[in-house]
């Protein structure tokens, strides 16, 4: 018996059911890589950030997440080069879905019990997504805005339900507004740290502040 179609598991009906010592024998999720492209690019290299935002409360299978990741990556590599972007899948499939296997061969009624003992065996994993939750983000250079929108539009076709594409006002994957970011870095209130930044608050030891601004 093959994999049941994902439309059977689209809606969030039950409580979250993660892999645990009580729920064993769960097959591995199809998606294993969540960051691709130029992951180690400094925070100031990729100021533009685009998000794919869910418009429904639903479940997305790990197969769909993997398909969307491959689709977006393929388009971005073709249009921006393999070092011109950084994609991050923001969902992780932790919810385990079950299947109560039914036999369909001749004489099956003697072998199986129908709906008696109908609690199924683990079949795969899905990610539960809320309205307004980000599914996937891409950061890149400002001139690649159209390519980001097109890559996310193509990836949208891999998912059920509705998604929106949103170009963020923040700088890259940080939580700081793009129009204030460079000023805050110049004032040393933000210190670049990989693909993120460290925020230096205006309180604390004075000698530490002097050492930073010397």
Curated annotation (Swiss-Prot):
List, alphabetically, the GO terms of the cellular component aspect: cytosol; cytosolic large ribosomal subunit; cytosolic ribosome; endoplasmic reticulum; membrane; nucleus; protein-containing complex
Q: What is the effect of changing residue 202 to N?
A: Rescues embryonic brain development when expressed in a zebrafish heterologous system
Outcome after substituting residue 161 to S: In MRXS35; uncertain significance
Show the cross-link location (Glycyl lysine isopeptide (Lys-Gly) (interchain with G-Cter in ubiquitin)). 188
Family matches, as InterPro entries: Ribosomal_uL16, Ribosomal_uL16_CS_euk_arc, Ribosomal_uL16_dom, Ribosomal_uL16_euk_arch, Ribosomal_uL16_sf
Modified how: Citrullinated by PADI4. Ufmylated by UFL1.
Annotated Gene Ontology MF terms? RNA binding; structural constituent of ribosome; translation regulator activity
Instruction: Give the position of the cross-link Glycyl lysine isopeptide (Lys-Gly) (interchain with G-Cter in SUMO2).
Output: 175
Q: Impact of changing residue 213 to Q on the protein? A: Risk factor for AUTSX5; no effect on function; rescues embryonic brain development when expressed in a zebrafish heterologous system
Q: Is Membrane tagged as a keyword?
A: no
Q: Which family does it belong to?
A: Belongs to the universal ribosomal protein uL16 family.
Q: Which purpose does this protein serve, as stated in its record?
A: Component of the large ribosomal subunit. Plays a role in the formation of actively translating ribosomes. May play a role in the embryonic brain development.
Q: Which disease is it linked to?
A: Autism, X-linked 5: A complex multifactorial, pervasive developmental disorder characterized by impairments in reciprocal social interaction and communication, restricted and stereotyped patterns of interests and activities, and the presence of developmental abnormalities by 3 years of age. Most individuals with autism also manifest moderate intellectual disability. Intellectual developmental disorder, X-linked, syndromic 35: A syndrome characterized by intellectual deficit, delayed psychomotor development, poor speech, and dysmorphic features.
Q: What is this protein called?
A: Large ribosomal subunit protein uL16
Q: Which gene encodes it?
A: RPL10
């Amino acid at each position: 018996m093959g994999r049941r179609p994902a439309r059977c598991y689209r809606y969030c009906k039950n409580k979250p059911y993660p892999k645990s010592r009580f729920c064993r024998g769960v097959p591995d999720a199809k998606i294993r890589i969540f960051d691709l492209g130029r992951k180690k690019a400094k925070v100031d290299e990729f100021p533009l950030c685009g998000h794919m935002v869910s418009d429904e409360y639903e479940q997305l299978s790990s197969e769909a997440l993997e398909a969307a990741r491959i689709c977006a990556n393929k388009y971005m590599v073709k249009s921006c080069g393999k070092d011109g972007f950084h994609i991050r899948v923001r969902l992780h499939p932790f919810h385990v879905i079950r299947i109560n296997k039914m036999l369909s061969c001749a004489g099956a009624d003697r072998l199986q019990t129908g709906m008696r003992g109908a609690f199924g065996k683990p079949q795969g994993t899905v990610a539960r997504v809320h309205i307004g939750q980000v599914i996937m983000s891409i950061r890149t250079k400002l001139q690649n805005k159209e390519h980001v929108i097109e890559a996310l539009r193509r990836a949208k076709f891999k998912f059920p339900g509705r998604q929106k594409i949103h170009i963020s006002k923040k700088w890259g994957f940080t939580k700081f507004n793009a129009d204030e970011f460079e000023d805050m870095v110049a004032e040393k209130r933000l210190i670049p740290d990989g693909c993120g930044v460290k925020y230096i608050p205006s309180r604390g030891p004075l000698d530490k502040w002097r050492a930073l601004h010397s």
